[in-house]
Amino acid sequence: MIRGILASTALAAGLAIASVSASADTVNLTIGKLLEVTGPLSETGPSQDKAVKLAVEYANEQAKKAGVAIQAKDVGADVQGDPQAAVSAARSLVDQGASCLIGPAITPESIAIANGVTIQKRVTIWPVGTSMRLRTIKDEGTIFRTVPPDSLQALALVNAAIDKLGTANGKLASVIYRNEPYGEGLAKDFSAAWTAKGGKVQGPTVFDPAQATFDSEAGQAVANNPDAYIIIDYPDTYAKLGAALVRTGKFDPTKALVADALAFSTVPSNIPPQAIEGMRGTRGGTPTGTDAYKIFDALWQKAGGVEHFSLDANSFDSATLCFLAAAAAKSSSPAAVTDHVRAVTTKGAPKFYLTTLAAALKAVDSGQKIDYIGVAGAFEFADNDDPTVSLFDIFEYQKGKLVVLKQIDATK
């Protein structure tokens, strides 16, 4: 009897040891979310949060299906639209073990986080911010973007303006932007591309977001009856700028084009309809007819809650790439994950999609390089780790809703 008990105990102990060993071999990954819950781009926070959660849940399911020993969880923090708060948020997520950080949406926040936290620790950042100012720092290969940078968005805005006006040649575009890196860089790139096409530029008119009113700037923007307005702003300040433009009595929103920070599914109630109805704009596009998008959208609709928002597919892709890189590295070490991003986005390697994510995980687990194509499309990272793909939506606000008119390749 005692011998039987000892045998049973030994067997149980052996099973426990085997279980612990198997558990120890599993890569436990933490993906951090730097969310704009409050601040000038708070409209983006809920959809980014949801996108990363869905990516983590789906990747975990596919890893289990593939028999690959990796599981992930997501943790989040509010960056508050402020670089100092963003650094504190990033530190808290890294302290919780985050190997990758998805977000933030504002470039000065990303720069502060990189300089203050992530470069030293080799933690990968996947920001939603598009400003080229991000590439003025030496990030040691730790900052990847799945969103097209503003060097490409400027070309998209030019194409959208030509689509509206028929030509750029001789046409006057009045450029007005919020005084911060996103506005400054995009205005500069647009102006250069517009004049290269034979167009003329008025301004740019620059405004401080802390101003109480923008009547003076609005008057400057509408002077000389321009053929088009190029407005680069955030929702909180456009509520005031838009009202000031309407007060001039000269502003026609159907002549205006905006960039991605003013792209939202439903127009916020504090923006006057007369300031936005009929306005067009550009944002990074997602090919909605693909099987990958159908899976993504099905997950989104099943989860309920917030509607799709600009760049939610890009945040989903960022989390998926972090997961794949960790699987390829067989490690959640931030440096190892960072070093394997290009191993899962290798041009010329076998292509995998969201529809074949389980197979992709098997491939990287066996040491193969792959070219993962995201929901938002291919990445084909340049030397500076920005995507070279350039699909953009051209949209128009109709009865308070964003309606996509067409999709374009900004480089053509």
Regions from the PLM with identified roles:
Residues 17-24:
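Sec/Tat signal peptide C-region and signal peptidase I cleavage site
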